[in-house]
């Protein structure tokens, strides 16, 4: 459910090889992953992290409040491409592909969703849309 807050209990351990502290932020019994490394997944102040998780049985987007150790569900239902989404430069929106057809924008304050672009019926949106640094231009792949 959009807006649902999921409390998390970070687990900390020391890496046996390096001696560095390693923090697991998501529960071991839920499959979670980050988006592609070149997409903007941290807020500008580095306090929040965008990730994909299967808390509700299908992949959806979540925004992890690192200091608060909780995640807020941003999208719902099946069909989210949880690898190619990204946060806008101003940290006010999530951009992602739904059902391989629609580029969507989610307002992070209201959680309202807008279809920004829909792929023609003869094509499939591959799911990887990349923005320039200030999110004024996007490039997408259609196959």
Would you name each region that the model predicts?
Residues 1-23:
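Blade/loop signatures of beta-propeller domains
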Residues 39, 60-62, 102:
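Conserved beta-strand and immediately adjacent loop positions that scaffold enzyme active sites
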Residues 5, 54-59, 96-100, 143:
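Short, solvent-exposed loop/turn segments at conserved positions within beta-propeller repeat blades
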Residues 23-31, 70-76, 112-120:
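A short beta-strand motif characteristic of beta-propeller blades
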Residues 33-42:
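Signature of short aromatic-glycine-proline-rich micro-motifs recurring in repeat-based ectodomains
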Residues 20, 37, 58, 82, ...:
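Short coil/loop residues immediately preceding or within conserved phosphate-binding loops
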Residues 79-88, 92-143:
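Asp-box/WD-like beta-propeller blade repeats and closely related beta-sheet repeat scaffolds
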Residues 14-18, 44, 48-77:
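Beta-propeller domains
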């Amino acid at each position: 459910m959009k807006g649902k807050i999921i409390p998390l209990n970070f687990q900390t351990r020391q890496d046996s090889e390096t001696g560095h502290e390693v923090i697991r932020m998501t529960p071991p019994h839920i499959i979670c992953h980050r988006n592609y490394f070149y997409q903007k997944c941290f807020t500008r102040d580095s306090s929040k992290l965008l990730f994909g998780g299967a808390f509700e049985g299908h992949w959806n987007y979540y925004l992890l409040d690192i200091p608060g150790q909780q995640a807020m569900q941003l999208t719902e239902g099946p069909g989210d491409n949880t690898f190619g989404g990204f946060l806008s430069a101003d940290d006010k929106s999530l951009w992602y592909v739904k059902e391989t057809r629609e580029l969507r924008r989610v307002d992070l304050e209201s959680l309202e969703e807008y279809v920004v672009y829909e792929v023609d019926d003869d094509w499939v949106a591959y799911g990887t849309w990349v923005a320039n640094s200030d999110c004024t231009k996007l490039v997408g792949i259609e196959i």
